[in-house]
Amino acid sequence: RGIFGKDLTLRDVLKFSKNFSVLINSKKCVIATDTRPSGHMITETVKAGLMQSGIDVYDLGIAPTPVAFRESRKYGAGIIITSSHNPIEWNGLKMVINGKGVNEKQLDTIINEQNPSKSKIGAEYKIESDYIDDAAKIIGRISDIPKVTVDIGGGAAKEFSSQLLEKVGCDVITINSDFEKSSRGPDPTTDTLQELVVNTKNRDIGFAFDLDGDRLVIVINGEKKNP
């Protein structure tokens, strides 16, 4: 990962996607992205590289990394277009194979030129995740209706976090839902989270996510808690 257009180009993305395809025994790969402006271009390039190499693509659209990781286990592989909590101009590829992140040997395969099979062109499918329903069953219903404020930070947790919390019985308010209007940066651990701090003074708890939804900061009684 790195600054898009400088450290990471579309040529790099195409190369890495094609090379990754040789590791996919299932011939199926889940794709998801966070909300970075460069995400759409990179996603389409990843799809092209995989499908050209005979891999069927299962597109989750914008989704948090934990959701995409779980779906990747079902299909055998996944590529998540994100640079996590890094600055907006950054982007990257998180790759999942057989339910795990890539190891050193697999990374070497991805970086170095490969000759993937071109026996057929892969197909593209739009998919949705059962993550919210499954997680809600595990958590169960919360009886006392806690008041929760969720600071999306303009990221991929937008729909997933609020829907899950509401499903288990929380009274949910969301702030910074839209990427273009977010009052803070992509990393909640380094931000003051002033809007969330103010908002949670009369609520039970606040949660702040990073752009790909795998990093969380908690605010209680108007005070940011160190992770």
Enumerate the predicted regions with their spans.
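Gly/Ser/Thr-enriched, mixed-charge loops and adjacent short helices
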Residues: K15, E89-K201
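Flexible, glycine- and charge-enriched loops at secondary-structure boundaries
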Residues: K6, L10, K100, P186, ...
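Gly/Ser/Thr-rich active-site loops/lids in small-molecule metabolic enzymes
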Residues: T174, K224-P227
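Loop/helix-junction capping segments adjacent to catalytic residues or to phosphate/diphosphate-binding pockets
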Residues: L10, G39-H40, P66, G155-E159
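N-terminal small/polar loop signature for handling phosphorylated ligands or for N-terminal nucleophile
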Residues: C29-W90, Q163-V219
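An N-terminal, well-structured beta->alpha segment
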Residues: R1-A48, Q52-G54, E124-V148
